[in-house]
Amino acid sequence: MTNILDGKKLAKELELRLHEDITEFSPEVGRPPGLAVIRVGDDPASGIYVSNKEKACNRIGLDSFLYHLGTNTSEQEILEVIKALNNDQKVDGILLQLPLPKGLDAEPLLKAIDPEKDVDGLHTLNLGRLLKGEKGPRSCTPAGIMVLLRRNNISLVGKKVVVIGRSILVGKPMALMLQAANATVTVAHSKTINLPEITNQAEVLIVAAGIPQLIGLEHVRSNAVVVDVGIHRIPMEPLKLTGSNYKLCGDVRAEEIYSKIKAITPVPGGVGPMTVAMLMVNTVNRWQYHCGLSSTLSDLLP
């Protein structure tokens, strides 16, 4: 029977734990954790993601500060906001919501964030820490996947793991975290030749290609564990994308491979909730660090 790796359920458990930590330690340090989110422009998907993060903050008792800037905001204006947040003692974590509007380069903005407040794990220093195996904030999506696999007793030691995707958000940090867990890792991407030949070797297949329904029966070996990072809104009928005439899907054709595999993350309800949960974990962890508290979350930090 195929096991469903339920990220939504686990995320709720993590939120309860974080709420308990915040309730216990806030009186001691005089304030709850604080997360600042910078959103530039009015991308609808970004609006949904930011709303989900705000709701999670409210559930666990974390202060949320939203800076919603206009589409035409200059790089210098955003840098000024980041500088102010770096110096704000109420703020433990800073997140720059991506993607940015056309004409804005994320790289100098991410570099401007204080590495100790970089709860998305995208600062050059924190990526270097990950590469060297040093402690520091980790990218939320791959970190959430690692926790989800571990909580479902899926061992990675010596396992053949294939990661499809090489983005700085997911693919590259994912591969490094898997290597640190003693997996044997192969990274595939859009230029990979004969993808099924490679993915059929995977005992654990992590798909972060950003291509709807890319992976099907021909790509998976029997009893594989499949993690589907993608989420897409596609028409139920060609050229129609209005009202309820659409469906959500991932990078994997889940129904097609379901009977062949050992376990899979659902879309929605798998990786997405874990990404938000790990953002909360990172922020609370930074709060504990800034306030001189001992970390209570080391088991959740890859």
UniProtKB/Swiss-Prot annotation:
One of its GO terms (biological process) is L-histidine biosynthetic process. Catalyzes the oxidation of 5,10-methylenetetrahydrofolate to 5,10-methenyltetrahydrofolate and then the hydrolysis of 5,10-methenyltetrahydrofolate to 10-formyltetrahydrofolate. NADP(+) binds at G165, R166, S167, S190, I231. One of its GO terms (molecular function) is methylenetetrahydrofolate dehydrogenase (NADP+) activity. It comes from Prochlorococcus marinus (strain SARG / CCMP1375 / SS120). This is Bifunctional protein FolD. Its EC number is 1.5.1.5, 3.5.4.9. Belongs to the tetrahydrofolate dehydrogenase/cyclohydrolase family. It catalyses: (6R)-5,10-methylene-5,6,7,8-tetrahydrofolate + NADP(+) = (6R)-5,10-methenyltetrahydrofolate + NADPH; (6R)-5,10-methenyltetrahydrofolate + H2O = (6R)-10-formyltetrahydrofolate + H(+). InterPro entries: Aminoacid_DH-like_N_sf (IPR046346), NAD(P)-bd_dom_sf (IPR036291), THF_DH/CycHdrlase (IPR000672), THF_DH/CycHdrlase_cat_dom (IPR020630), THF_DH/CycHdrlase_CS (IPR020867), THF_DH/CycHdrlase_NAD-bd_dom (IPR020631). The keyword Membrane does not apply. GO terms for cellular component: cytosol. The gene is folD. Gene3D superfamilies: Leucine Dehydrogenase, chain A, domain 1, NAD(P)-binding Rossmann-like Domain. It comes from the Bacteria. It holds the Pfam family THF_DHG_CYH. Pathway: One-carbon metabolism; tetrahydrofolate interconversion. PANTHER family: C-1-TETRAHYDROFOLATE SYNTHASE, CYTOPLASMIC (PTHR48099:SF5), C-1-TETRAHYDROFOLATE SYNTHASE, CYTOPLASMIC-RELATED (PTHR48099). HAMAP family: THF_DHG_CYH (MF_01576). Homodimer. Keywords: Amino-acid biosynthesis, Histidine biosynthesis, Hydrolase, Methionine biosynthesis, Multifunctional enzyme, NADP, One-carbon metabolism, Oxidoreductase, Purine biosynthesis.
